[in-house]
């Protein structure tokens, strides 16, 4: 498996023809964030590889997730009567979240600034963005947590799916239309949650207990914003863009079945994971919510990454992600009835396997594309120039 190649020769040929095509109509992004990023990118040295900026931002997101997992492992820290997360943690998480968001915004500008834009950079950026969504949602959950003043773990599970499907819709659009319509929700949510983290440090989590309007709690606002953004902005815009492409005869696929293929694996993942929750003899989501969310988010990220590879290379998306096979078997075993500790072991084993499989997929795809385009993923130096330097050294030049 160490040398397994996930990207086919047909896909590599498709990457050679790929040209970045994206549309960003978000006013916040256009009139506030892009001018800010244009200023920030000038701080970075021109020898700094864009992918290194992207990866650094992703690591900050992971750090926030782990930091909050330490102080709030089971999402009870914000509930009344429990030890709350220290104020300094909220400040750190808020600052790092905004820094990560900024790095995600300047990586493409650094690529254009250094004339180092490649399909690998686009795939690397969107692939890590895709995995980041589960980290974002789960970390934000700690603001409200569970309990009488919070949101139930099952409601958060459903909200996670709303966010995940909102992300994949934009890449499903590009798979069918050839144009990536950047979602409005991402920029708005990143700025908002960074601000809310800092506010939480100032006013304390107790401030979120109180109703802010007509007994409407902040937790309800949190839920309404996620669902409202998905149903009133993301989904309508995606369908509108798809319909426009259909009317203009610019759809890449003429079959409804083929157009929907990229959504099969995510939908099946939702069905299987939800079935596990509903059939669980030990109420697995209540026992290990953080691990369950991460398992779902990682499996989803793997399916979405495969879609991104296919839409960038103009190849057919696989109908089924093989990670769903062991998940199906686990759900089948759980339905037959197992002891609580056995179910927990199955969850942790499956989560570990999914994580290792996804990391292996990412590393191998990056290595394949780096070799294909003759570049280093984290350096602007060219492999050919290194070889030339060694040859000159050997002949005494």
UniProtKB/Swiss-Prot annotation:
Keywords: Acetylation, Endoplasmic reticulum, Lipid biosynthesis, Lipid metabolism, Magnesium, Manganese, Membrane, Metal-binding, Phospholipid biosynthesis, Phospholipid metabolism, Selenocysteine, Transferase, Transmembrane, Transmembrane helix. It catalyses: CDP-ethanolamine + a 1,2-diacyl-sn-glycerol = a 1,2-diacyl-sn-glycero-3-phosphoethanolamine + CMP + H(+); 1-O-alkyl-2-acyl-sn-glycerol + CDP-ethanolamine = a 1-O-alkyl-2-acyl-sn-glycero-3-phosphoethanolamine + CMP + H(+). PROSITE patterns: CDP_ALCOHOL_P_TRANSF (PS00379). It is a multi-pass membrane protein. The chain crosses the membrane at residues 47-69, 84-103, 123-145, 150-172, 179-201, 221-243, 256-278, 291-310, 317-339, 344-366. Its main location: endoplasmic reticulum. Its EC number is 2.7.8.1. Pathway: Phospholipid metabolism; phosphatidylethanolamine biosynthesis; phosphatidylethanolamine from ethanolamine: step 3/3. It is an enzyme of class 2 (transferase). GO terms for cellular component: endoplasmic reticulum membrane; Golgi apparatus. The keyword Transferase applies. It holds the Pfam family CDP-OH_P_transf. The keyword Transcription regulation does not apply. It is found in: Endoplasmic reticulum membrane. Coiled coil: none annotated. GO terms for biological process: phosphatidylethanolamine biosynthetic process. The modification N-acetylalanine is found at residue 2. Its cofactor is Mg(2+); Mn(2+). GO terms for molecular function: ethanolaminephosphotransferase activity; metal ion binding. Ethanolaminephosphotransferase that catalyzes the transfer of phosphoethanolamine (PE) from CDP-ethanolamine to lipid acceptors, the final step in the synthesis of PE via the 'Kennedy' pathway. PE is the second most abundant phospholipid of membranes in mammals and is involved in various membrane-related cellular processes. The enzyme is critical for the synthesis of several PE species and also catalyzes the synthesis of plasmanyl-PE, a lipid required for proper myelination and neurodevelopment, from 1-alkyl-2-acylglycerol. Belongs to the CDP-alcohol phosphatidyltransferase class-I family. This is Ethanolaminephosphotransferase 1. It comes from Pongo abelii. The gene is SELENOI.
